[in-house]
């Protein structure tokens, strides 16, 4: 089994809609086992720009993380599907040992 993690910003868009929503819908259409989306309260990336949620932030671009655990073949298919999407984020995979599913 593989873990796919995708880090992106809350403001990242695809066809005018939130990118994370597009990615979840695409994963669903491809029959992925499941996707979890996390919304961070604070973080920074390789550009070292701090993103955070507080009262004074009028328009925060908070970190969004998608996690998918699935068979390697499905992860690779999903990666090919999203390869042409341009966003400023991080995508990586890792081998995982699933102890329990379902």
Curated annotation (Swiss-Prot):
It comes from the Bacteria. Coiled coil: none annotated. Pfam families: DUF190 (PF02641). Belongs to the UPF0166 family. This is UPF0166 protein TM_0021.
